[in-house]
Amino acid sequence: MLIIRNCALTLLACLLAGLTHAAPVVEDVATPDEAITKVWSAAKFLQNKGASGFATLNSKDGPWVWKDSYVFAFDCRLDRMVAHPMRPDLVGQPIMQITDNNGKYIFKEMCKAGSASPSRGGWVEYVWTRPGAGRVSRKLSYTFMTDIAFSTGIQVAAGVYDDKLSIDEVSKLTEKMADPAKYPAH
């Protein structure tokens, strides 16, 4: 009994000292349908606000940051990040040469995916540092092309960190959500 008590006290001490890494709580993990909804909402917001809406997208405390995800926006034609709440150092910078840890040109792929189906957008898989985790994880990002005043082809995107979902599965979800008869909430 003394051994069990000592083990429990040691575990408690480790938890209090922050020596263990807790897995994210399910409520703290963004889902693909949330990413799609946030991207569509942000695209509509930018259509209404124009370039002045980028300031809201850049805010870490704004409506476009939730759980472990965030909306960001970039201009493929001008090769520039236009809004990124977690990486303000990227705003205004060239993006086409940015690669993930596996050498994938992330933004080139996102530009292709978002432009391939302008009415639906598309998904890209890559590895990226997860906010708050400090480690690289598999990420699926949904990107959707929108036009705003004086600027065409702005890509609005958000991602989810997931080791199980396939691009095919999230693409089917996008199709379902884009059809109001099947998904009346949108």
Where does each model-flagged region fall?
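N-terminal membrane-sensor/transducer module of prokaryotic signaling receptors
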Residues: 2, 11-186
